[in-house]
A protein has these predicted regions:
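A basic- and aromatic-enriched beta-loop-alpha substructure that forms the phosphate/nucleotide-
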Residues: 65-140
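Basic, amphipathic N-terminal segments that precede the first structured/catalytic domain
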Residues: 2-97, 255-257, 261-262
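Surface-exposed cleft-lining segments at the edges of enzyme active sites
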Residues: 72-73, 107, 128-156, 185-195
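A structural motif corresponding to the C-terminal end of an alpha-helix
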Residues: 91, 153-172, 205-219
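Acidic carboxylate-rich catalytic motifs and surrounding loops in phosphoryl-/glycosyl-chemistry enzymes
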Residues: 173-177, 213-231, 235, 261-262
Length: 262
């Protein structure tokens, strides 16, 4: 759960040539930045595979030693387990844009006996010994009444804290619909047993709550995926044109805060 943060935030130097971007979420935001003009953005921080429900809890004592194939994977699982997203954001008050997409929420979360939460990421499940640990945890599925209710409460607190930090107006949610088909017309496969339509419908209810909180959201419909995407075929791995559209939306949003192009 989220909690108040009392210490003063650090400011980031604004004397830069590219839009300084903090990415919180998944591949939609990260790929948009990665596929853009390399001079357009400076990625100051990338927080991946962290559900909003884990923020403010500390599940590290519940987990075995985190041995993973890459340092990045270990860092992300450790940050998720520590629940310290807000501490990272407090260092970023000078960023131009905070990009957020909700894709990781699809995985659901695990709650332990002490109330702490860990995101049900593929990386978490890959940790040796995690299977037996999760046998004693309770799974909260994406789209369930409990997940939605708790997520909305967490989102309300999260946005309120961003407002206190003067970051709410720099928050932009990227929300293209998952693609039902790829550019060749082939239907995309179900994800974790659920249809693309299921995910688009459920995500829309979460996004509606953010809209009610006054959060800026970029919604794109009629999307198509690219089976030759750098990270493989998936309904959220889009064709290049969609990333160009998102790039334009980000630049337009950023210029409202800093009225000059870079």
């Amino acid at each position: 759960m989220l909690g108040g943060m009392q210490d003063s935030a650090e400011a980031v130097d604004l004397s830069k040539e590219a839009w300084r971007v903090f990415v919180y979420g998944g591949c939609v935001s990260r790929d948009t930045v990665a596929f853009a003009d390399p001079q357009a953005y400076s990625l100051v921080k990338y927080v991946a595979r962290n559900s909003l429900l884990s923020v403010g809890t500390d599940a590290r004592i519940q987990l075995p030693e985190l041995v993973l194939p890459s340092a990045f994977q270990k860092k992300m699982v450790d940050l998720d387990a520590s629940g310290e997203l807000l501490q990272e954001l407090r260092k970023m008050r000078g960023v131009d844009v905070i990009l957020w997409d909700l894709n990781i929420e699809r995985s659901g979360v695990w709650q332990f006996d002490d109330g702490s939460i860990a995101t049900n990421s593929a990386e978490l499940r890959r940790v040796e010994g995690m299977g037996s640990v999760l046998e004693n945890a309770r799974f909260i599925a994406f789209g369930s009444e409990e997940h939605y209710s708790r997520w909305c409460t967490a989102a309300t607190m999260f946005v309120a804290i961003l407002k206190e930090l003067e970051l709410k107006e720099r928050l932009l949610v990227l929300a293209p619909e998952w693609a039902a088909k790829d550019i060749q017309g082939a239907k995309n496969k179900r994800v974790a047993g659920e249809s693309i339509e299921f995910y688009n419908h459920v995500f829309s209810t979460y996004l509606a709550h953010l809209e009610n909180l006054g959060v800026a959201i970029v919604r794109l419909a009629d999307t198509v995926s690219d089976p030759d995407h750098k990270w493989g075929s998936a309904p959220f791995h889009y064709e290049k044109g969609l990333y160009n559209r998102l790039d334009e939306e980000i630049r337009s949003f950023a210029r409202k805060k800093n009225p000059f192009d870079r």
